[in-house]
Curated annotation (Swiss-Prot):
Keywords: Allergen, ATP-binding, Chaperone, Nucleotide-binding, Stress response
Name used for this protein in its record: Heat shock 70 kDa protein
Pfam families for the chain: HSP70
MF annotations from Gene Ontology: ATP binding; ATP-dependent protein folding chaperone
Matches recorded under SUPFAM superfamilies: Actin-like ATPase domain (SSF53067), Heat shock protein 70kD (HSP70), C-terminal subdomain (SSF100934), Heat shock protein 70kD (HSP70), peptide-binding domain (SSF100920)
Species this protein is from: Davidiella tassiana
Length: 643
């Protein structure tokens, strides 16, 4: 059976897991880290994803893209997008009403949609899983914030398609965290659980009941634009103002200085979760000025005071929606790295009259953990008793309906309705002999459609002439388990039907765009592999040259070398090392040719010393890091270790 993975696609970090042999495995990346930064960097020579991208962000701030999750499925004019752009060092432009990142890549200006950036991160997570599992992975469950709307969910699903994944399901992050909590709990009777999920960029609260493997979400609330990054922003603003006050210089327009300050602020924020005080020390932050300051937990809580207060509002709303008393919540489960902040934990505890939240699950990994379990269930893995007994019932986060006369929102599916669900309602015409109706689909909680999000619209034409109120038009909303919706309308008199194909009017990618992005993704992957091959060839040549140099200077070898051979070999090695220094961007073929050239000089000399029994001592390492690519130097002697 093909393996299916669970991916927590986070704003700041992503995580991947697999459920097999009755246990969850969170898979570490090539750096040994169990979470991978959601960063993609573009340079003159290559594309970097994850740790390598984040590590170089200070020297390449304009071409390192992060926070794609804060842009995905949104419109360029959204207030949140406009606010975020003030903090982004990279350029965000408008294309067809959508935010698109613009970078310099290999000397060209390139535009990437948030879906494409997210797909690159998903590809990285997929490759991490594949190298661990030793095979191809196609199936995945991807998580999204519970409060993501239809277009954000669809855009995330599109990102999965561009990454070449078969997305089995889009599931809500707090629900996934609930699975992580409830999987091993064998309690009797029903348990009321509140999931408090505060990540790097989003915040969700979900209330659910768990009973004998049935996870039923009762209500959900949240803020798709509140997380650890917002606390970082507050610290950055605070300390850039302090720098200005102390040194009379404004660093707010210098992307590199701001990035270095942000990295220091993020580190300080993490330290303050376990210490009451920390210091920030940045050498030559701006115009040669060193910046040294201290930060206390009290000051951090002060600069983010309103954000902390805002944390509790969705919790109150969730309980209010389901008419639940605080005292009947049996367990509070924390998910997302930002729940490590002591102030957040204290607010949660105080809100529940001193009840301590459960800390038995790792908040960074809980969401990927639950997604991996759901992936195993959806891929048909029945090998485990735990997965066989689990049933997940989630809810619609926002009310869904159509616009009726006077711009009124008439909801067909109310928020917190269990999904999947299908609802139909009959409407009629507003004026006599009306030939058609415009069905406009909205999502949101306000009474007037002008205040909420238009998802899409379509026309039902060909209605027979009749007085107003006579034609019967049945509108059906079909909301699937991913939280993605199809809408159809039927005019009962004529049997005319039409259904919505929500396209670019709500930011969806067309089939052609997805196919183009898939082709681009494949092209970038090939380029990445070619660059890796080029670097491997360069490392192989460098390694071979220095290995020869060490061999020549070995006293045991030196005494066997004639002066002429030594001079020839040393000259060839020095020439090669100088050539490498001058040709850092040479092609793989050029490095291989240079290696062959060096081998043609070195091999005859080495043969004289060692005869036919061995190769150059300590010569090129075997295939691996620093080794030449296959085919390089095939005509030389075999390489063996020689004492």
């Amino acid at each position: 059976m093909a393996p299916a993975i669970g991916i927590d696609l986070g704003t700041t970090y992503s995580c991947v897991g697999i459920y097999r042999d009755d246990r969850i495995e969170i898979i570490a990346n090539d750096q040994g880290n169990r979470t991978t930064p959601s960063f993609v960097a573009f340079t003159d020579t290559e594309r970097l994803i994850g740790d390598s991208a984040k590590n170089q962000v200070a020297i390449n701030p304009h071409n390192t893209v992060f926070d794609a999750k804060r842009l995905i499925g949104r419109k360029f004019q959204d207030a949140e997008v406009q606010a975020d752009m003030k903090h982004f060092p990279f350029k965000v432009i408008e294309k067809a009403g959508k935010p698109v990142t613009q970078v310099e890549f290999k000397g060209e200006t390139k535009d990437f949609t948030p879906e494409e950036i997210s797909s690159m991160i998903l590809t990285k997570m997929r490759e991490t899983a594949e190298s661990y599992l030793g095979g191809t992975v196609n199936n995945a469950v991807i998580t999204v914030p519970a409060y993501f709307n239809d277009s954000q969910r669809q855009a995330t699903k599109d990102a999965g398609l561009i990454a070449g994944l078969n997305v089995l399901r889009i599931i809500n992050e707090p629900t996934a965290a609930a699975i992580a909590y409830g999987l091993d709990k064998k309690q009797e009777g029903e348990k009321n659980v509140l999931i408090f999920d505060l990540g790097g960029g989003t915040f969700d609260v979900s209330f659910l009941t768990i009973e004998e493997g049935i996870f039923e979400v009762k209500s959900t609330a949240g803020d798709t634009h509140l997380g650890g990054e917002d606390f970082d922003n507050r610290l950055v603003n605070h300390f850039s103002n302090e720098f200005k006050r102390k040194h009379k210089k404004d660093l707010s327009d210098n992307a590199r200085a701001l990035r270095r300050l942000r990295t220091a602020c993020e580190r300080a924020k993490r330290t303050l979760s376990s210490s009451a005080q920390t210091s920030i020390e940045i050498d030559s932050l701006f115009e040669g000025i060193d910046f040294f300051t201290s930060n206390t937990r009290a000051r951090f809580e002060e600069v983010g005071q309103d954000l902390f207060r805002g944390n509790m509002e969705p919790g109150e709303r969730t309980l209010r929606d389901d008419k639940i008393d605080k005292s009947s919540v049996h367990e509070i489960v924390l998910g997302g790295g930002s729940t490590r902040i002591p102030k957040v934990q204290k607010l949660v505890s105080d809100f529940f009259n001193g009840k301590e939240p459960c800390k038995s699950i790792n908040p960074d990994e809980a969401v990927a953990y639950g997604a991996a379990v759901q992936a195993a269930i959806l891929s048909g893995d029945t090998s485990s008793k735990s997965t066989k007994e689990i049933l997940l019932l989630d809810v619609a986060p926002l009310s869904l309906g159509i616009e009726t006369a006077g711009g009124v929102m008439t909801a067909l599916i109310k928020r917190n309705t269990t999904i999947p669900t299908k609802k139909s309602e009959t409407f009629s015409t507003f004026s006599d002999n009306q030939p058609g109706v415009l069905i406009q689909v909205f999502e949101g909680e306000r009474a007037r459609t002008k205040d909420i999000n238009l998802m899409g619209k379509f026309e039902l034409s060909g209605i027979r002439p009749a007085p107003r109120g006579v034609p019967q038009i049945e509108v059906t909303f079909d909301l699937d388990a991913n939280g993605i919706m199809n809408v159809s309308a039927l005019e009962k008199g004529t049997g005319k039907t039409n259904k919505i194909v929500i396209t670019n009017d709500k930011g969806r990618l067309s089939k052609e765009e997805i196919e183009r992005m898939l082709a681009d993704a494949e092209k970038y992957k090939e380029e990445d592999e070619a660059e890796a091959g080029r670097i491997q060839a360069k490392n192989g040549l460098e390694s071979y040259a220095y290995s020869l140099k060490n061999t020549v200077s070995d006293p045991k070898v030196e005494e066997k070398l004639s002066a002429e051979d030594k001079e020839t070999l040393t000259g060839a090695i020095d020439k090669t090392v100088a050539w490498i220094d001058e040709n850092q961007t040479a092609t793989k073929e050029e490095y291989e040719a240079e290696q062959k050239q060096l081998e043609s000089v070195a091999n005859p000399v080495m043969m004289k010393i060692y005869g036919a029994e061995g190769g150059a001592p300590g010569g090129m390492p075997g295939q691996g890091a620093g080794a030449p690519p296959p085919g390089a130097g095939d005509d030389g002697p075999t390489v063996e270790e020689v004492d």
